Amino acid sequence: MGWNGGLTSPSMEEHFYPFLMERSPSYMGEDEEEHGDEDLSLVLERKDKDLLLAAELGKALLERNDQLMKAKDALEEELRETLEMIEQEKHNMRLKMEVQESEWRAQVADLESDLAEARLQMQQLLSEQRECGRESASAVQELSEQNQRLVEQLAQASQVEQAITLEMKSLKEENRDLTISRGQFAPCLQSLRSENALLLEKKKEMESQTKQLQEENDNVQNQLISAKEGVFQLQRQKEDAKSQVLQLELEAQKLRDSQRTLQLQLKELQDELHMRDSQFSMRGTHSSLHSEIQQSTAVQNHEKGRNSAETQSITSGYMDTYLTEREGDLLRENEEQTVRLQDQVTMQHIEITDLRKEVQRLKDLLQQNNADSTVKQAVLDRDEALMKKAELEQELARCQIEKESLNLQLLSTIQQKVMLSQELEAWQDDMQIVINQQLQSQKQQETQKPPESPQNSFLRRDSKRGKILSFFKNI
């Protein structure tokens, strides 16, 4: 094989196998050094072998190059398929990201609306909290005033107790003085001991009574607090009921407006029916239908006037709560008004049933006469409006009954609170009057009596001590 069958040029052979070009001089140098007398045939034979070896190596390199080109084409094809798959996945991911972005935007909008609602609720809660804080501050102020009065009463009781302890100390000193003459005053000493024991027992009783009074006062304060909470709740319920009544009145006004429009349409339809009665032979049937419509319109106007009068009488029945002697009369009037409202509700039930019967009868007449579809629709609309109006009036009456019952509960709670406060004030006034009278009588007795002997003064102290103990025992 020559150069054209193997390698393309010597430069290519030198590029791939440079060791061949380096090998020939080495062989030649060795041959010159070792075998200087070797002939030219051996050198040519060696060169031929080297050329054959180089040709075989070139052939192997070409085969390897073909394999590498095929592998390169396969890798390029695989790379192209991989790039197409990557582009497809990128497109799918882009679509998914757009869908997710739209979903995220919707979620963000929902979250923003929820955040706005939460802010509104937070503002409402803050306003309610401020209102509760003001109410609790007023309640705390009232309770602090009551506690101050109780502290003053306890201070007075402690002063009396200190006076008794001072008298007991003086008695002990006198007892020590009298131990010298025990033989002479033995019966008096015995009586003093018994009186001392009685004083100690009465002191214990007085302490127990003061504890009972404190417990009763605490119970009264707890009842007052619970009553105030009930009053606040009833006031809130009353405000809710008022707002519901206003909403019902607005709805009733809307229904009245729609009723006026329906009456105008009905009047126009009646004129058309009157025009058609002159053209057709069904005068008797249409005249009966006309009279039925007029009767139902008159009944509707009568019910409208009566219901408006009832609504005015109900709305004018709001009473102001006064803590006076007229509370019992107000309660009785509220009960009577509740009974009247219940009777009105039953009457409205009966009227609704009558209206439904009238509607059914008019429907039957319309089906028998085969009148115009516009007339049917107008009558049906009017009947539906009447039924809705009756239902709204019934709901309004029910709300009025609930409101009156809440007013009754509020008045009863206020009465209980007033009675408890009056009893507490009366008890405090009685205690103050009795204490003042006792102190004045003691001062008058001390100023009127002349100075006495030590024995008489001792007996006077015993009598004074007995009066004070009898006073606390009576309390």
Curated annotation (Swiss-Prot):
Region (Disordered), start-end ranges: 286-318, 440-459
Q: Does the keyword Cell membrane apply?
A: no
Q: Where is the composition biased (Low complexity)?
A: 440-450
Sorted UniProt keywords: Coiled coil
Polar residues bias (residue ranges): 286-300, 308-318
Xref: InterPro entries: Spindly/BICDR_Dynein_Adapter
Coiled-coil intervals, chain numbering: 56-275, 340-413
- Does the keyword Protein biosynthesis feature in the UniProt annotation? no
PANTHER family from the xrefs? Answer: BICD FAMILY-LIKE CARGO ADAPTER, BICD FAMILY-LIKE CARGO ADAPTER 2-RELATED
Q: Which family is annotated?
A: Belongs to the BICDR family.
Name the UniProt record assigns to this protein: BICD family-like cargo adapter 2
Q: Which organism is it from?
A: Xenopus tropicalis
